[in-house]
Regions:
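Juxta-kinase regulatory segment immediately upstream of eukaryotic protein kinase catalytic domains
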Residues: 2-59, 278-340
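Hydrophobic residue at the +6 position relative to the catalytic HRD Asp in the kinase catalytic loop
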Residues: 196, 201-203, 488-495
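Residue-level marker of alpha-helix boundaries and capping positions
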Residues: 101-102, 173, 385-386, 465, ...
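C-lobe/activation-segment region of protein kinase-like
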Residues: 211-280, 507-574
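Conserved ATP-binding subdomain of kinase catalytic cores across diverse folds
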Residues: 42-165, 181-189, 193, 279-280, ...
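Activation-loop N-terminal segment of eukaryotic-like protein kinases
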Residues: 203-210, 495-503
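Protein kinase-like catalytic core scaffold
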Residues: 81, 120, 141, 209-214, ...
Length: 591
């Protein structure tokens, strides 16, 4: 793909961006400023941008902070403004700005691209550039806040779910159409946003519930000499990745229909184009998910690797640092705390519920020690990950893929002094896992044994059907996202919140048996289905009709042959029989 930077469309008033007469020049130290006349005094003081003054007055808030840029919000009497401070932490960023101009200047100029095609966007009011011997280094872009607008992802996740169902459905429909119009206009003009996700789209809901959308982060906006349908397809996949996990197929279809209706031309084959978007979305999602899945392996803005004595840990930054150091000093101490509740004591593991400081507040957590079963266990960790690490990594994979599971807080491994174990002293002997406790929650096994039998027959039938649908959706979600759990059973599934709600929310625990395999082989699907089927065999009121209902919900009905369930039914039955006979031969009970 060939990208080119073209001159911005001419302004109707002939106004020059970042130049006189509308813009005034001011020098403060080594930072030169182009600022609109009516904003010069509110923004700039004798020493430049009034950041320290605003910080002292409590007007300054940090919205985003990273190695490459810091975003501030300042509430001024003239109105709220956002300040993007672009940093140059390495030579790569410095050379980039010397060749391609500063990000602040680029983003400011590209506002005209969108203005010319009727897409709302930010309005620059000041540009600051730090130069040393005429070479550009750090730079700033200041823009007023768009009134009553919030990022689209924040709106979809936090605000929209709290609205009444009828209004929520209406706004979702309007959102799909508005987003389709915005994207079609952008592509018709030959523009591609290389970071096209809802966080870079602002939304404001008008009085008639219709949304007004505005695009931000324009440094990622590119002009394509010849925008082909394959280019548009890949760009749509970037946006579709977010909604693929958070919206229904009908919403995505409505968006695509509106997008194609507004476009000035049509793809050669609409069906092939639509399937191509789904394929590109899945490929892009897998790339992102695997990248996010590696976050738990070292130090970054989400996790911190720590070592003290003969123990080391990778802990979430949400867990208080003092808690982590206490665990490194004595990993077994939480089991002896006064508030600790032992949940399980066995040859393979010890599990307790206790309290730790998470995000500055006390929270109940699940603390699990994976015991050493054999003297060879430390040596085996040299060839394969320990059970605690497998569960830790699986939890991160599931969180990255938006599969419900308790939040990972810390992984701890304890070694031995050389004098105690001259052979394996440097390898993990005991490993520990800390996860946030889901509350309120009950395991599906406990609910099936203690609650279901006491319900009236009609209520029990309805509850069994509700649980069946929820289980099928959960397993389909796992498999669609390339995850397999060989030990998926009722005791490893939590029911979150009230069990009387229409849609039951489920969560998966005990993730030692979870594996990431892409693409997921068919035999893995059958094994997971058969394991869950055996675990549900003794649920009161569950019939073979419920098993069929589960299978039909699990299969993407309408996207697979209508008789495909028969072959899968026979394969599950055969795998269940083999599992039952094997456990009987080994003298192990099914659970």
């Amino acid at each position: 793909m060939i990208w080119t930077f073209t001159k911005p469309p001419p302004n109707p008033r002939g106004e020059r961006m970042f130049g006189p007469p509308e813009w005034q020049w001011a020098q403060a130290g080594d930072v030169g400023w182009w600022v609109r006349a009516d904003w010069q005094h509110p923004l700039l003081g004798p020493e430049g941008l009034r950041l320290d003054e605003w910080r002292g007055q409590g007007r300054l808030a940090v919205i985003k902070k990273g190695p490459h840029r810091v975003v501030y919000r300042v509430d001024l009497p003239e109105g709220a403004v956002y300040i993007k401070h672009y940093l140059v932490p390495s030579w790569r960023e410095k050379v980039r700005q010397w060749i391609r101009r500063g990000k602040g200047r680029n983003e400011g100029r590209r506002t005209r691209y969108l203005d010319a095609i009727g897409i709302p966007t930010i309005t620059p009011i000041a540009l600051g550039e730090q130069r040393k011997r005429k070479f550009l280094f750090e730079n700033y872009l200041v823009t007023p806040a768009i009134p009553d607008a919030v990022p689209l992802d924040e709106f979809v996740e936090d605000r929209l779910p709290t609205w009444p169902p009828i209004r929520r459905a209406r706004v979702r429909r309007y959102l799909a159409e508005a987003l389709g119009v915005l994207t079609a206009r952008m592509h018709d003009a030959g523009f591609i946003h290389q970071d096209f996700h809802p966080g870079n789209v602002l939304v404001r809901i008008e009085a008639d519930d219709r949304p007004t959308l505005a695009m931000i982060d324009l440094d990622a906006l590119r002009v394509c000499r010849s925008l082909k349908w394959s280019h548009a397809q890949r760009n749509l996949a970037l946006l579709n990745h977010y909604f693929w996990l958070r919206s229904e197929r009908t919403d995505r279809r409505r968006f695509l229909a509106c997008y194609l209706r507004v476009r000035q031309s049509a793809p050669p084959n609409v069906r092939v184009f639509a399937r191509g978007i789904e394929t590109s979305t899945r490929a892009w999602a897998e790339l992102l998910w695997r990248r996010w899945g590696k976050r738990c392996q070292g130090t970054n803005k989400y996790f911190k690797k720590l070592r003290r004595g003969f123990a080391w840990s990778i802990a979430s930054r949400d867990l208080a640092r003092t808690e982590v150091y206490n665990l490194l000093d004595d990993p077994d101490a939480p089991f002896l705390r006064p508030d600790a509740v032992l949940l399980k004591v066995s040859r393979t593991a010890t599990v307790a519920e206790t309290t730790m400081t998470v995000k500055g507040q006390p929270a109940r957590v699940i603390y699990k020690r994976f015991n050493r079963k054999k003297w060879l266990d430390p040596l085996l960790t040299y060839f394969r990950p320990s059970r605690a690490w497998q569960a830790w990594q699986a939890g991160q994979h599931m969180a990255s893929r938006a599969v419900p599971t308790p939040t990972n807080l810390a992984f701890i491994a304890r070694t031995r002094p050389f004098r105690e174990d001259p052979l394996f002293w440097y390898l993990p002997h005991e490993t520990y896992l800390v996860t946030l406790k889901a509350d309120p929650a009950v395991t599906l096994n406990e609910y099936a044994r203690a609650v279901l039998p006491k319900l009236p027959p009609d209520d029990r039938r309805e509850q069994v059907r509700t649980i069946t649908r929820a289980l099928a959706r959960l397993l389909r979600m796992l498999h669609e996202r390339s995850l397999s759990d060989r030990d998926l059973k009722t005791s490893n599934i939590l029911i979150l919140g009230a069990t009387s709600q229409e849609v039951i929310r489920l969560s998966v625990i005990d993730l030692v048996g979870v594996r990431l395999i892409h693409p997921l082989p068919h035999h893995r699907r059958v094994q997971n289905l058969s394991r869950l089927h055996l675990s549900l065999a003794d649920v009161p009121g569950r019939t073979r009709t419920d098993a069929l209902r589960f299978l039909r919900t699990y299969l993407p009905w309408g996207l697979t042959p209508h008789n495909d369930w028969k072959r899968l039914w026979r394969e599950i039955e055969a795998a269940s029989r083999i599992k039952r006979e094997r456990n009987l031969h080994r003298g192990r009970e099914l659970s």
